[in-house]
């Protein structure tokens, strides 16, 4: 099965090199690697020129194609016509040697799969427990494994605002648990949302779908938007044996005020992708959880070391929420597969 790897990057030459070196060590190597660089300098271009990687093509995009979703759409337009699977990786990830072997084999195991995601293994400490285990209020339990729950979910459980869906599925009021809440069992799980930076899709779906132009620049939640639309047409899976590490490089991220606004406004947009006409109870829950999460972040002004960062992001969230009363998010160009 032929597959292409698209890596969209911005001002991160060293993390990108680390990723490419891990790709070089793969037991199954990509038929094509496309580097889509939105950098405003030539450091990444120079790094690529100094290092040789088989099947690699480099593109430095102009301003009009800069930004995660634009770069992804640009990359898709450059994929070889013979390719069957298109893979995406964040530029600050590092793969285990059998990542692609396990990821691509999922399409053979599930021939009707439209998309398959990999598994980030370095962000959460999981512990295997007995099958009859009863989790504590500050724990999350799933499929024989437990992990510590964050303060936001602990409070949500106490207030009756926890999600009623499995990890990787979005409830009618959104604010679900991501695929990051799937344990490292080595199993393959069906989901309806994939993390864009560790995802793959059959190339044929791009004849119908594209990444939304609403998500410009950093593109927060663009992966949720895209995968939710695709999941309405077919099955998506996460293979927890396709492992990689994510190191969250600082370069190329928006300021925290803009990020806070994105959390709320982009979150609202994705919620309406899943549920374009929510019932009153779902509207109330979405707003209640959004306000609760803002208050939790605001409390970090007192509890966290970086008080300025907590305040700046909280202000962005507050302004983002109020802005929904004035102007709700709307895609500049309605993407195919979207009903809103």
For each predicted feature, which ranges?
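A recurrent flexible, glycine/aromatic-enriched loop bordering the glycosyltransferase active site
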Residues: 159-171, 181-200, 231, 253
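A conserved acidic beta->alpha catalytic loop
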Residues: 29, 35-47, 93-95
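Conserved donor NDP-sugar-binding/catalytic core segment of glycosyltransferases
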Residues: 98-166
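Active-site-adjacent helix/loop segment of glycosyltransferases
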Residues: 236-309
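Short, well-formed alpha-helical segments that are part of the catalytic scaffolds
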Residues: 12-26
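A short, conserved alpha-helix in the catalytic core of glycosyltransferases
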Residues: 192-209, 216-242
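Short beta-strand-to-loop acidic/aromatic patch adjacent to the donor-nucleotide binding site
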Residues: 82-94
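Glycine-rich, basic loop-to-helix element that forms the pyrophosphate-binding segment
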Residues: 63-81
């Amino acid at each position: 099965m032929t597959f292409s790897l698209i890596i969209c990057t911005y001002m991160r030459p060293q993390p990108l090199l680390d990723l490419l070196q891990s790709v070089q060590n793969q037991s199954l190597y990509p038929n094509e690697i496309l580097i889509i660089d939105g950098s405003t300098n030539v450091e990444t271009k120079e790094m690529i020129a100094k290092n040789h990687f088989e099947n690699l093509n480099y593109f430095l995009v102009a301003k009009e194609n800069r930004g995660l979703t634009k770069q992804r759409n640009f990359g898709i337009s450059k994929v070889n016509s013979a390719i069957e699977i298109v893979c995406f990786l964040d530029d600050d990830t590092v793969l285990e040697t059998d990542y692609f072997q396990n990821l691509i084999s999922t399409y053979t195991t599930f021939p009707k799969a439209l998309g398959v995601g990999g598994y980030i293994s370095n962000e959460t400490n999981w512990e295997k427990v007995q099958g009859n285990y009863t989790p504590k209020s500050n724990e999350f339990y799933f499929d024989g494994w437990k992990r510590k729950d964050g303060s936001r979910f602990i409070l949500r459980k106490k207030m009756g605002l926890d999600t009623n869906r499995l990890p990787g599925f979005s409830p009618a009021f959104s604010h679900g648990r991501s695929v990051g809440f799937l344990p490292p069992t080595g199993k393959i799980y069906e989901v309806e949302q994939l993390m864009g930076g560790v995802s793959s899709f059959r190339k044929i779906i791009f004849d119908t779908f594209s990444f939304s132009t609403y998500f410009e620049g950093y593109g927060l939640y663009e992966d949720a938007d895209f995968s939710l639309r695709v999941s309405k047409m077919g099955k998506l899976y996460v293979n927890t044996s396709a492992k990689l590490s994510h190191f969250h490089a600082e370069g190329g991220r928006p300021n925290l005020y803009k990020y806070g606004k994105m959390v709320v406004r982009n979150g609202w947009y994705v919620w309406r992708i899943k549920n374009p006409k929510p019932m009153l109870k779902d509207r109330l829950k979405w707003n209640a959880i959004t306000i609760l999460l803002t208050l939790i972040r605001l409390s970090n002004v007192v509890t966290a070391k970086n008080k300025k960062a907590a305040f700046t992001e909280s202000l962005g969230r507050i302004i983002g929420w109020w802005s929904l009363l004035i102007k709700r998010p709307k895609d500049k160009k309605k993407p195919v597969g979207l009903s809103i």
